[in-house]
Structure formats: C-alpha cells, structure tokens
Amino acid sequence: MKTIISFLLLIFIFSCSAPKEEQLKKQVKRYASVIKVKPEKLDYYKELHANPWPEVNAMLKECNIQNYSIYYRDGMLFSYMEYTGNDFEADMKKMAADPMTQKWWKETDPCQEPVESAEEGEWWAGLEEVYHLE
C-alpha cells in the first residue's frame, strides 16, 4: 500500500511540474515570408532544395527553427517556419555568421529578388498573419 501511495504521489508531482501543452504551444512563434524567384533560376533553386546541405539544415535546427517549408507559385516563393527559441535576433545573427550558411546563400541569393513592397534592406519580406487555427 505504501508503494502505491508513493507511486501515485510521484505521478502527481510530475504531472504538476511538466509543461502543459498550452504552454508549449505559446513558445512557438510562426513566421511567413515571400520573395520572387528569377524564372531562369527556378530549376536550379528547386534542385538545391531537393538536396539541401546537411550542415545548413543542422544550423536551422540549432537556431531553434522547426517545421520550415518553402512553397512556389507564379514566380513567388512563400516560406513558413516556426521558431522555438528565446532570442530570435541572436539566433538569426548566429545563422548569418555560419560559414556553410553563407555558402548556401551564395547559391540561393542569385536565384531570388525582393518583392516590390519589401522594406529597405529586406530580402524575404515578412508577412502579417491574419488567421491561425490551433
């Protein structure tokens, strides 16, 4: 009987201290952005992303990015990602300083051009979220 009570007490303690699903969801920040792809570079861009460099994928994960996707339609690339870290700016600086990521961008950047509405210095233009369903 003492063992059962101890076991139930342990379960209660762990269930109270474990992060709730709602808390975990709140830690995820969603980002979407858009950029043009040059028509003559589309096939090369798709080829690169069909076989992404493992080091680049590892850096994305190391910088707290998950569930990252890029879609294409009518000359436009649309990206979606989820960020789970605590300092987005620091993680983006870390990624930008990574030598393999820099090499990757030297391959992908010539394939792209900012949309007309991009802000000064903005490459991928951030999008406003207008709806989300949990």
Enumerate the language-model features and the residues they cover.
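C-terminal motif of bacterial Sec signal peptides marking the signal peptidase cleavage site
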Residues: 13-15
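Short, flexible turn/loop "capping" segments at secondary-structure junctions
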Residues: 23-29
